[in-house]
A protein has these predicted regions:
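Glycine-rich nucleotide-binding loop
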Residues: 199, 232-238
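Conserved phosphoacceptor histidine of two-component systems
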Residues: 53-68, 72, 76
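Short beta-strand/loop element within the Bergerat-fold HATPase_c
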Residues: 174-187
């Protein structure tokens, strides 16, 4: 299919990172920018580094707002759903989209400030599960996650913490959930989520489905991570990955 002349191309990457470029019709790409006096596009003038940075920041802000809106819509639909399973699935979707929206606010040119993302999400996780008597502690070393991995890591963290809060503090028992993200001596990073709940048999088929391990293992493979789970005096999930 031939390329249109002077076409405006927008592509959203796998991690919600928005890149927009202009094609000049001769095979060369030039950074897009607006007219000084209006909102149109001008191909005759290059943008300065400061203008590019401001545009990128604006795009991140708009993407975050869009994801938060989708999260709110999913949550509203879950409240109107008649079937409990439908409500559960829509709530899960709302939580996942909301987490990605929060992640967008911490993207920089160098990567995603994952510690700042976790700091923002911690009170949200506590509030979502306020009916459970859970003590949630999150610690994270200063880590910049690349765009190619940040969204996947955010979804894994969201899933593991959600599971720990639901199952580790089941039957209205008080519980403790510890989350830790840091670097290992070999240069790799690890994410550890542990609870002091009743535990379970990870080899049991019903347990794999119940805890959504299929989802976490699938995402772990996307970041070439090594995921492991132990159940002794609670459950400890560990993901070792490279950045």
């Amino acid at each position: 299919m031939p390329r249109p002349q002077n076409g405006f191309f927008c592509a959203i990457g796998a991690n919600s990172w928005l890149f927009c470029r202009l094609h000049d019709g001769r095979g060369a790409e030039k950074p897009f920018h607006r007219h000084r006096g209006g909102g149109g596009l001008d191909m005759g003038e290059e943008r300065t580094d400061g203008e590019v940075a401001r545009t990128a920041s604006e795009l991140r802000h708009r993407m975050a707002n869009t994801l938060q809106l989708l999260s709110a819509l999913s949550r509203m639909r879950s409240q109107r759903a008649a079937e409990p399973e439908t409500r559960r699935q829509l709530t899960w979707m709302a939580d996942a989209i909301g987490s990605l929206g929060a992640l967008e606010r911490h993207r920089t040119e160098q990567g995603v400030n994952f510690a700042a993302y976790l700091q923002e999400m911690t009170p949200i996780w506590r509030r979502r599960h306020s009916s459970r008597q859970a003590e949630l502690t999150v610690t994270c070393e200063p880590i910049l996650a690349p765009d190619t991995a940040a969204s996947t890591l955010a979804l894994i963290t969201q899933e593991l913490i959600g599971n720990a809060l639901v199952y580790g503090c089941a039957d209205d028992r008080p519980g403790r959930i510890d989350v830790r993200v840091g670097r290992l001596e070999d240069g790799r990073c690890e994410l550890v989520v542990s609870d002091d709940g009743p535990g379970f048999d990870p080899s049991a088929p019903e347990a794999r489905e119940r805890f959504g391990l299929w989802f976490v293992r699938s995402l772990s493979a996307q970041v070439r991570g090594e995921f492991s789970l132990t159940s002794t005096q609670g459950v400890t999930c560990r993901l070792v990955f490279s950045l």
